Swiss-Prot record:
This is ADP-ribosylation factor GTPase-activating protein effector protein 2. It comes from the Eukaryota. The gene is AGE2. GTPase-activating protein for the ADP ribosylation factor family. Residues 137-180 are annotated as: Disordered. It comes from Saccharomyces cerevisiae (strain ATCC 204508 / S288c) (Baker's yeast). GO terms for cellular component: cytoplasm; cytosol; Golgi apparatus.
């Protein structure tokens, strides 16, 4: 949050005052940029540190450039206007020789500030300050919004009166509209009840039809299952008398095999005998040939 423009202008105007050209306590530093806004004096940074050591119950310090200022912080500064007028109150009973003395030593400066503000040794009377309560030009210029306040208040009064009249006396056209609205609401309620009854009837009819179709489908499924069972059981049932007689007829008409010997068996036996005879003759020939060769080589 930054300092508003009117407050900045007021601070700059106070600092331009010739009475604020020196520090209010040490009188040695020029152009002070700090202030004790609770005491209403402009001081240097060295004296500001001593003021802070006293505590906020005695002195509240702010920087002109670093801290945020509000209108309430300027009340005491505007009341005294400058350091000369403030010292005429805080140093009223101090000797004239000491009033203009410049203090540079830190310890002596601390004692002086404590005696001046904490112990209030030299404090005077506010009524003795010249022009302190006179009506001078205000340093902080506020926007002239008070002139427009009566007109705005009159408008607010008129609007409030009109609102009260409308609340106390309801117009006739509002009553007629309310009656028409109630009749319309009754018609809408009746139409809604009829539509709900019709929808309930149709929904019940559709539910009954769906139940009938489901039962018909179940009956058809049971019939198909019974047919399948019958066809399967017929495969495993005992044969009837007609099938037994037919089987006996087919068995009686089939021819029985005879025990006559086949000529193929004898022919096989004779062929084997001939083969054995031929092998014996060939073996005899081979032996004779060997004997001939033996005679030749011998």
């Amino acid at each position: 949050m930054s300092t508003s423009v009117p407050v900045k202008k007021a601070l700059s105007a106070l600092l331009r005052d010739p009475g604020n050209s020196h520090c209010a306590d040490c009188k040695a530093q020029l152009h002070p940029r700090w202030a004790s806004w609770s005491l209403g004096v402009f001081i240097c940074i060295k004296c500001a540190g001593i003021h802070r050591s006293l505590g906020t119950h005695i002195s509240k310090v702010k920087s002109v450039d670093l801290d945020t200022w509000k209108e309430e912080h300027l009340v005491k500064l505007i009341q005294f206007k400058n350091n000369l007028r403030a010292n005429s109150y805080y140093e009223a009973t101090l000797a004239d020789e000491l009033k203009q003395r410049k203090i540079t030593d830190t310890s002596s400066l601390q004692n002086f500030i404590k005696n001046k503000y904490e112990y209030k040794k030299w404090i005077g009377d506010l009524s003795s300050i010249e022009g302190l309560n006179d009506s001078t030009e205000p340093v902080l210029h506020k926007p002239s919004a008070n002139h427009s306040l009566p007109a705005s208040n009159a408008r607010l009064d008129q609007s409030s009166n009109s609102l009260q009249k409308t609340q106390t006396q309801p117009p006739s056209h509002l009553l007629s509209t309310s009656r028409s609205n109630t009749s319309l609401l009754n018609l809408q309620v009746s139409s809604l009840s009829k539509t709900t009854s019709n929808t309930s009837v149709t929904s019940s009819a559709t539910s009954i039809g769906a139940a009938n179709t489901k039962t018909g489908n179940r009956v058809g499924e049971f019939g198909q299952r019974n047919d399948l069972k019958k066809s399967i059981l017929s495969l495993y049932s005992k044969p009837s008398a007609q099938t037994q007689s037919q089987n006996s007829f087919f068995t009686s008409t089939t021819p029985q095999p005879c025990n006559t010997p086949s000529p193929f068996v004898n022919t096989g036996i004779t062929a084997t005998n001939n083969n054995s005879m031929n092998s014996n003759s060939s073996s005899n020939i081979s032996l004779d040939d060997n004997e001939l060769f033996k005679n030749v080589w011998s």
